Amino acid sequence: HPEGNVWTHTLETFRYRKPIGHNRGAYDFRLSLGLLLHDVGKPLSASSGSNRFNGHAELGARAANKFLERLGYDAPLIADIHYLVRNHMLPAALPRLPLAKTREIMESPLFPALLELYRCDESSSFKGPDGYYESSAAYQTYLRNRRNPYRLADGKKIGRQNARGGNHGRS
């Protein structure tokens, strides 16, 4: 990390956390654990050429599971942190990936927390928050299209007969 080592970067992400509601001292516990553990897989990962820390998200998710189990956290919380750590790199690619590859992840009730983790991660690095803004815009477009009965979730218009309950494009 240009900002130092992985630990320095991890601590830096906490500076960008936003409190929940009006209580300035209250933070989302899941997000805090996600920030703490999002790069835990980096020391376990391999590097090849210019691709440093290859596979660190997957390795980190497994390590986070073991760590949280050992501390006695319950399975639902562990599953939430697994989702955040495993997918923390995905928002960077969101604007360029086809909907078929991202729909399931964006449908998760945890996706807003994942975007927030990504914002903190990006803001604490030399990159800044531009990638977050692009990913957030892609997510907002997805949500807007999903709510529109005349568009598919990818934004394509539905034909008139399909919108009125026709064959929905099936033969």
Give residue spans per PLM region:
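Surface-exposed beta-loop-beta
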Residues: 1-8
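Charged substrate- and nucleic-acid-binding regions of tRNA-handling and nucleotidyl-transfer enzymes
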Residues: 66, 70, 110-171
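Divalent metal-dependent catalytic cores for phosphoryl transfer on phosphate-bearing substrates
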Residues: 16-129
